[in-house]
From Swiss-Prot:
Protein name in UniProt: Cell adhesion molecule 3
Taxonomic superkingdom: Eukaryota
Subunit structure: Homodimer. Can form trans-heterodimers with NECTIN3. Interacts with EPB41L1, DLG3, PALS2 and CASK.
Lineage: Eukaryota, Metazoa, Chordata, Craniata, Vertebrata
Disease listed for this protein: Charcot-Marie-Tooth disease, axonal, type 2FF: A dominant axonal form of Charcot-Marie-Tooth disease, a disorder of the peripheral nervous system, characterized by progressive weakness and atrophy, initially of the peroneal muscles and later of the distal muscles of the arms. Charcot-Marie-Tooth disease is classified in two main groups on the basis of electrophysiologic properties and histopathology: primary peripheral demyelinating neuropathies (designated CMT1 when they are dominantly inherited) and primary peripheral axonal neuropathies (CMT2).
Amino acid sequence: MGAPAASLLLLLLLFACCWAPGGANLSQDDSQPWTSDETVVAGGTVVLKCQVKDHEDSSLQWSNPAQQTLYFGEKRALRDNRIQLVTSTPHELSISISNVALADEGEYTCSIFTMPVRTAKSLVTVLGIPQKPIITGYKSSLREKDTATLNCQSSGSKPAARLTWRKGDQELHGEPTRIQEDPNGKTFTVSSSVTFQVTREDDGASIVCSVNHESLKGADRSTSQRIEVLYTPTAMIRPDPPHPREGQKLLLHCEGRGNPVPQQYLWEKEGSVPPLKMTQESALIFPFLNKSDSGTYGCTATSNMGSYKAYYTLNVNDPSPVPSSSSTYHAIIGGIVAFIVFLLLIMLIFLGHYLIRHKGTYLTHEAKGSDDAPDADTAIINAEGGQSGGDDKKEYFI
C-alpha cells in the first residue's frame, strides 16, 4: 500500500508544478502578439492596436477580414484613405479606420513573421444606427372613449433596436417589439403597436415612440403624434361682481369648455317659462338688480357633441353700506383739512404762551423808545419795589 500512495503523491506534486504561476511564466511566449476586440458605430473611427514584447527583429503586420494587408510596419499596403497609420515601432503597430461601414465588420489579423509566424485576432463589431421612428395609424380626431391604435417602425439598427411608447410622462405598454432582417442581411427593422382608450384629458396629448439602441449612447431618437379628442361640453356660471347687491349691474357669465367649444348658450330661470332674452354672447345681463331677480338660473351650453346645463342661485342682497368713492374722497379731504387746522391751533397756543412770557420786556423797550422815558423808569422801579417791599411804595427819580 506504500508504493501506490507514494506514486499518487508524486503525480499531485507534478500537477501543482505545471499549473503554478511560476510554471505558467516559464511557458509564456514573448514573441506572441496581442490585440483587443473593438466595437464602433457606423460612420465612426476605430483604432486597431497590436503589441508584442519580443519582436525578434521582425515587423508587425495588419490585414483585413479578406486577408488583404493593410500595413506592414510603417508601409501602407492597401490604397484606402480611410486607413491611417497611428503608431509604428518594433513593439507596436496601431492603425485607424475612419468612416467605418457595416462591410468593415469582421476579424482583423495582426501577424509577426517569426519562426513560426505568430498571429492575433481582433474582432471589429460595427453598430448600425437606427433611423428615426415613423408613427402610423392616426387618421383623424377621435371621440371620447374611442380606442386608438398606433404603429411605430424603425429600420437600420444592428443589433436590433427596442421600441418604447409613452403619453406625455406616462409610459404606455405596447406590444413586444417585432424584428425583421433588412435586405442587406446586416441590419434590422423593428416595429411595435400600442392600443389605448382615449379620454377628454388626452385631447392635445402627444404619443411618443422612442427607439433605444447602444449606438445612440443615451441620445434621444423619437417621434411624436399629437392626437385630438372630441368630447361633450361642460359649463360653469361666474357672477360679476361676485357678491351682487340690489341696484347694481350684474353679469352672469356662462363659461363653456369642450372640443369643439360650445357655440350656443340658452338661459332659463326656474319658474319662468320663456327663455331669458337679455343676453350678451354667453352672459346674462341684469342692468339694475332687484329683489325679484333672486332665484335659480340655468345655462345650457351646446355643441355638436352634446349639451350641458349649469345652475347658479342668485340671492340679491340689500344695497351696500359701504360709502361711495366720492364720499371716501370727501372724507380724506376733510381729514387733511382737520389736521391742518389742528396744527394751526397748536402753533397759535405756542405763540400766545411766548408773547405772555416776554410781555414785560416788550413794554420796557417800547417805553424807553418814547418821550416819557424817565417816567417809565420810575414806574418800573416802583413796580419792582412793590413786589419786594410789601405795602410801602416809594418813588425814585433817575
